[in-house]
Every structure is written in structure tokens, then in C-alpha cells.
């Protein structure tokens, strides 16, 4: 294998391990990727195995975790599923879809995963590493671990942490979150549970999310270094809500920073919600305030409502019916409301959902065909084969503009010809990518299969202007910066903040 022959010649990879989940590994990797890019290195992100329903589709149609796609943007390279060779997408009841190198290859229970998938998983990780280095022999891999590297009941079967570190002889950083408390016990406990040869790989410690005067931790820093004989290479202060966690869902949970927002958006909090990165562009709009809708309520206070993607569309539609939210959405539509569904949300807005292969949460024969919300005359059937691809098209509504995004879905949607009273129109020149309906009473119902639709600045502005016109507000001013430019600025600011408090020099040998 190419890599094993060249291992002694490659630039030392940097691996970011954490004392726990949520310690800040993802953002640390993102920051390091951009710092090294700015130093004219060729960084490439890597995470052997990730568990997330927040996915991205690369240019070859391969699925990967969104966090690795974001890290690729920080590196200035195109995302590739090789950067995240194993993606586990939870489906509920301890069952996950298994994706190897971007392609779905089955489902597994948590109990059976390591028994059935450990060996093939390690092979696909090695295959990806080999391919990355063969294509980019001068790159420096920036690797993200997962959770804690010393879960002793799982350590011998852990594909994502120390097994990769030892295989690549990586320079490892241990990141810990001081905001949670117990930082000394976290660091010492993690290191004590490592074997001597594993501990030798740890070249630096980062204290993350420190609040207050950094000089107040000097004594703590000295104690850690004396106790562990490992340098503390960074004490990173608490960074405000400008920088989202890995999947950005936690940021949305507490979103209220634009207190003077003119448009209030409600997002239905589905139990199996997926691809919530679809909302990131809206979070950055100063005119918009986002709130989660978790239970049945009067929806009149919202200027428009988003029904998001779902990993289990049948199951989530049953949730909407059970909670009364389906009824609430119909009432909202009848009262001149604006609703947009994305992927699974589009499917639920239709008249019927059929799941003959039990792909979307059906458990019994009676659940294989259920009614949708009934706001669009569309029928969806879920098949075994999944469609994953990048999209370039042109919108017809609410404006004519070029559109980019991606699709991830098992369902195939077609017009329900039994519902002649519900007239709908295509949103895009590619007719099967989305539909919309204008209500006689006012308001619109729209649905699209395109993830990332709101990243398209012209389309997003015109959709928001449609809502603003409904409220008799002036149209948005012509924008001076695109969403992608804003994302770049956020990544650059993140790297600058980390760079002020981080010393990577000892790891770049």
C-alpha cells in the first residue's frame, strides 16, 4: 500500500483528541486547518468515523458529515467522502445507517456494529488514507477524534481515535472544556487510561472555553505541565455564539441574537431532524429571528415556517399527526401562512407517503402507507436505492436565478392526480426538484429536494422579500456580501482567535 511505504516521508499529521464529547474538537480542527492554510501548508481534514444526520454530498455524489465538509472549506479544498470514510446516520432505536466512502451499504444495531463492521471499517479507513496521500503527497492531515479516546469498554474496538493516531504516528493534541468543570481530573484521568506508547503521542494540551482573565490560569497550567510532562500549548477563551458547534443545532437552540429582527421564522423540531445546516444562512440574516416549534400551538406569530429534512419521514409525519402539528400547519396555511418544506419536509407536505421497503420508520403494514399533511398534491414512495448528488439548476420562483445545492433522499415524488383542486407549479427548470402553490387566501406552500437552498443569495433574498412584502416591509437592501463570503469570514475569524492563544510550532516538525 502506497501510504505504508511512504509513512516515514509524510508530514506529521496533527490529531485532535478530546477528553469528552463536546470538548471542542471540531472547531479546533477547523481553526487549525485555516491557520495552516494561511501558512501556505496543504492541510486536509480527516475523521475516520462520524455519527451525524447533518450530511453533505461531494461532487461524486458521496455522503459525508457536514463538519468535515466545513473543515475542507477551511482548508480551501473541495470536500470529499474520503475525508470521512465512515458515516453513521442514526435512525432511532439504536439502529444506524452505515455509509462507507459516501455510499450506503446497510444498517446495523449498536450491539452488532463492532462485531460486524469493525474489520471492514478499518479497511475502508486505510483505503481512504492511502488515497488521500497518493493524491496529495505533500499534505498535512488534520485529524479529528470522536468522543473520548479512553472509553475502556469500547477502546479495543475504537476506529476513530488512538488506532488512527498509532497507525499514522500522529502528533496528538488533547482538548478539554474548562466550562464544564473538572478540567484537571479530565486531563489526568484521560492520560492515566492510556498505554505508555499512546501517551507518548500526546504532544500538547489545549484548555478550551476559558472565561475571564487568562493569567488567572497560570498556576493551573504550571500544575498540568508538571504533572503530565506535556506542554499546555493553548488556553482558548470562550468564543461567543459566532462560532457554532459541530452540527450547529446547539446554536439554534439558544438563538436570539437578532433581537430587532423584522421576520420571525418557526422551524418544526422533528424527532428525526436531519441537515439542520440548511438553516445556517438564515441565522446570519440580521432581519430574521429563528425559533423552534416543539409542540402544537397557534402558529400565527410566525412569518414563515420551515418543515425540515428527516431521517425517518414516516415516523416524523406520524409525530406531526399525533401532536396536532399537522392540523396547526393546515390552519396556518388557511390563514395566509407561508410554509416551505425541505426534502423530508417536502414529502410530508404532500397527500400520501408510501414505504414498501420500510426505509423511513415504518414498523407495521398499516404504517407503510399514510396520509401526509395534504397541502401539496404530491405522493412519495420510498425505495431502497438512495439518490445523492450535487445540483445545479435554475429557479423559476420566486425569481429566476442560478441554484446550487445537493440531494439526499430515498423517496421519489410525483403529482397526485386525484387532487385536481390543488394546482401547483414547479420551482425549478428541473421539474422534480420542487413545487409551490399560491393560496387563494394569500400565502404560499413550497417544497424542495435541494439541501442548501438558502445558501443561494439571490433566491434567499427574493423568498425573504416575498415574506416582507406580505408584511408591507421594504425589500432587503442589495447585499454587499454573499453567504459563502460570510462563512469564509467566520472561519477566518475563528482561526485568528485560536492563533492568538495557540502555539503549534512544536507539532509542525
Swiss-Prot record:
Record keywords: Cobalamin biosynthesis, Glutamine amidotransferase
Signal peptide: none
Family, similarity comment: Belongs to the CobB/CobQ family. CobQ subfamily.
SUPFAM superfamilies tied to this protein: Class I glutamine amidotransferase-like, P-loop containing nucleoside triphosphate hydrolases
CDD domains listed in its UniProt record: GATase1_CobQ
Domain GATase cobBQ-type: from-to ranges: 262-459
Pfam families on file: CbiA, GATase_3
GO BP term, pick one: cobalamin biosynthetic process
InterPro entries: Class_I_gatase-like (IPR029062), CobQ/CobB/MinD/ParA_Nub-bd_dom (IPR002586), CobQ_GATase1 (IPR033949), CobQ_synth (IPR004459), GATase_3 (IPR011698), P-loop_NTPase (IPR027417)
UniProt organism field: Prochlorococcus marinus (strain MIT 9312)
Pathway the protein takes part in: Cofactor biosynthesis; adenosylcobalamin biosynthesis
The protein's name: Cobyric acid synthase
Protein purpose: Catalyzes amidations at positions B, D, E, and G on adenosylcobyrinic A,C-diamide. NH(2) groups are provided by glutamine, and one molecule of ATP is hydrogenolyzed for each amidation.
Catalytic residues of the enzyme: 343 (nucleophile), 451
GO molecular function annotations of the record: ABC-type vitamin B12 transporter activity; catalytic activity
Amino acid at each position: 500500500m502506497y501510504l505504508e511505504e511512504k509513512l516515514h516521508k509524510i508530514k506529521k499529521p496533527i490529531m485532535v483528541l478530546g477528553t469528552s464529547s463536546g470538548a471542542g474538537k471540531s472547531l479546533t480542527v477547523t481553526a487549525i486547518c485555516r491557520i495552516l492554510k494561511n501558512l501556505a501548508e496543504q492541510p486536509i481534514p480527516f475523521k475516520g468515523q462520524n455519527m451525524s444526520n447533518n450530511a453533505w454530498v461531494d461532487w461524486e455524489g458521496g455522503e459525508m458529515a457536514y463538519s468535515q465538509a466545513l473543515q475542507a472549506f477551511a482548508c480551501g479544498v473541495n470536500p470529499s467522502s474520503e475525508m470521512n470514510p465512515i458515516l453513521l446516520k442514526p435512525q432511532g432505536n439504536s439502529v444506524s445507517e452505515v455509509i462507507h466512502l459516501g455510499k450506503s451499504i446497510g444498517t446495523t444495531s449498536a450491539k452488532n456494529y463492532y462485531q460486524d463492521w469493525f474489520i471492514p471499517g478499518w479497511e475502508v479507513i486505510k483505503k481512504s488514507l492511502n488515497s488521500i496521500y497518493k493524491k496529495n503527497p505533500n499534505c498535512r492531515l488534520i485529524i479529528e477524534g470522536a468522543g473520548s479516546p479512553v472509553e475502556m469498554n469500547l477502546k479495543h474496538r475504537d476506529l476513530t481515535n488512538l488506532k488512527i493516531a498509532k497507525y499514522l504516528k500522529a502528533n496528538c493534541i488533547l482538548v478539554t472544556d474548562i466550562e464544564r468543570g473538572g478540567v484537571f481530573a479530565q486531563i489526568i484521568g484521560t492520560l492515566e487510561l492510556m498505554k505508555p506508547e499512546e501517551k507518548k503521542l500526546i504532544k500538547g494540551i489545549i484548555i478550551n472555553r476559558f472565561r475571564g482573565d487568562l493569567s488567572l490560569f497560570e498556576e493551573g497550567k504550571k500544575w498540568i505541565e508538571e504533572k503530565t510532562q506535556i506542554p499546555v500549548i493553548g488556553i482558548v477563551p470562550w468564543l461567543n455564539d459566532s462560532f457554532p458547534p459541530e452540527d450547529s443545532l446547539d446554536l439554534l437552540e439558544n438563538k436570539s441574537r437578532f433581537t430587532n429582527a423584522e421576520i420571525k421564522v418557526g422551524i418544526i423540531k422533528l424527532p428525526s431532524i436531519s441537515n439542520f445546516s440548511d438553516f445556517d444562512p438564515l441565522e446570519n440574516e440580521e432581519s430574521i429571528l429563528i425559533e423552534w416549534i416543539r409542540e402544537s400551538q397557534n402558529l400565527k406569530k410566525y412569518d414563515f415556517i420551515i418543515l425540515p429534512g428527516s431521517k425517518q419521514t414516516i415516523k416524523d409525519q406520524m409525530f406531526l399527526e399525533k401532536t396536532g402539528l399537522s392540523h396547526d400547519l393546515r390552519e396556518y396555511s388557511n390563514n395566509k401562512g407561508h410554509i416551505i418544506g425541505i426534502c423530508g419536509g417536502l414529502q410530508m407536505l404532500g397527500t400520501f407517503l408510501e414505504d414498501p421497503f420500510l426505509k423511513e420508520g415504518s414498523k407495521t403494514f398499516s404504517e407503510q402507507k399514510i396520509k401526509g399533511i395534504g397541502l401539496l398534491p404530491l405522493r412519495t414512495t420510498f425505495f431502497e436505492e438512495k439518490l445523492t448528488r450535487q445540483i445545479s439548476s435554475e429557479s423559476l420562483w420566486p425569481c429566476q436565478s442560478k441554484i446550487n445545492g445537493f440531494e439526499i433522499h430515498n423517496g421519489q415524488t410525483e403529482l397526485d392526480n386525484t387532487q385536481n383542486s390543488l394546482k401547483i407549479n414547479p420551482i425549478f427548470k428541473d421539474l422534480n426538484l420542487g413545487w409551490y402553490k399560491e393560496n387563494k387566501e394569500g400565502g404560499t406552500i413550497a417544497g424542495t429536494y435541494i439541501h442548501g437552498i438558502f445558501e443561494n443569495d439571490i433566491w434567499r433574498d427574493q423568498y425573504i422579500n416575498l415574506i416582507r412584502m406580505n408584511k408591507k416591509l421594504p425589500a432587503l437592501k442589495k447585499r454587499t456580501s454573499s453567504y459563502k463570503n460570510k462563512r469564509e469570514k467566520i472561519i477566518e475569524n475563528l482561526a485568528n482567535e485560536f492563533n492568538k492563544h495557540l502555539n503549534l510550532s512544536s507539532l509542525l516538525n
